[in-house]
A protein has these predicted regions:
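The beta1-alpha1 cofactor-binding region of Rossmann-like NAD(H)/NADP(H)-dependent oxidoreductases
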Residues: 1-12, 44, 168
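Short C-terminal tail/terminal secondary-structure segment
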Residues: 33-36, 87, 175, 186-205
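Substrate-binding pocket helix/loop in short-chain dehydrogenase/reductase
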Residues: 37-39, 43-48, 155
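Active-site helix of classical SDR
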Residues: 62, 98, 106
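Residue(s) in the substrate-gating loop at a strand-loop-helix junction
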Residues: 82
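Short, small/polar-rich loop/turn modules that mediate ligand/substrate recognition or access, typified
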Residues: 114, 119, 185-187
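C-terminal helical subdomain
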Residues: 122, 145-185, 192-194
Length: 205
């Protein structure tokens, strides 16, 4: 499904609600790394494509979900931002911009939807173990003329725990935010990043 197609997203939610009997939780977890290049070399098509996947899809899913969440008497929305949406990320301007925007979107809709008992939060993961971070490492290494291992070691060294995040740490926080234990948490951006202190400079002088 094209997550940037408003009509397709709306139809998907209508079908899902019909099949499941309602909707009380939305987790926006679609994303794309986008191009790895200096800002002056990023094409407009690349910028728009990255925004469509990372930001517009989140907006459209929220827009489609809200009527169903209201009908249910409330619920929880959790969107995936990134540590890049907190520190920035050299050579990844479209991705970082989209992830910063998700924080702003989350805080705005939390203000709008709180009266409907719909809580809206986002998670800002650091490097999460898995195939996706491996592709990010490979792209960054190629752009900087370095080995994959050196990039991986550098990224791990930027965390106080000196390790990447297990995927189960992300899912555990989602479960918490969507449960009654998270009932008073709204409009927040929560970091799960092994104590990340920043992505650092793009290159060493």
């Amino acid at each position: 499904m094209d997550m940037g197609d408003s009509a397709a997203v709306t139809t998907f939610f209508e079908q899902a609600v019909s099949h499941l009997g309602g909707l009380d939780i939305l987790v926006n977890n679609v994303g794309s790394a986008g191009p790895t290049a200096p800002v002056e070399e990023v094409g407009l098509d690349e910028w728009n494509a990255c925004m469509a996947v990372n930001l517009t899809s989140t907006f459209l899913c929220i827009q489609a979900a809200v009527p169903h969440l209201r009908a249910a008497g409330g619920g929880s929305i959790v969107s995936m931002s990134s540590a890049a949406g907190k520190f920035g990320f050299p050579l990844r301007s479209p991705y970082a911009s989209a992830k910063w925007a998700i924080v702003g979107l989350t805080r705005t809709i939390a203000l709008e939807l709180g009266r409907d008992h719909i809580r809206c939060n986002c998670i800002q993961p650091g490097p999460v173990e898995g195939e996706r971070i491996s592709r990010v490492i490979q792209a960054k290494a190629a752009a900087e003329g370095r080995s994959d291992n050196s990039v991986r070691d550098q990224m791990a060294a930027m965390t106080t725990l000196r390790r990447f995040v297990p995927p189960t740490d992300i899912s555990a926080l989602i479960l918490f935010l969507c449960s009654d234990y998270g009932a008073s948490i709204n409009g927040q951006s929560l970091s799960v990043d092994s104590g990340m202190e920043g992505y650092g400079p793009a290159t060493d002088d």
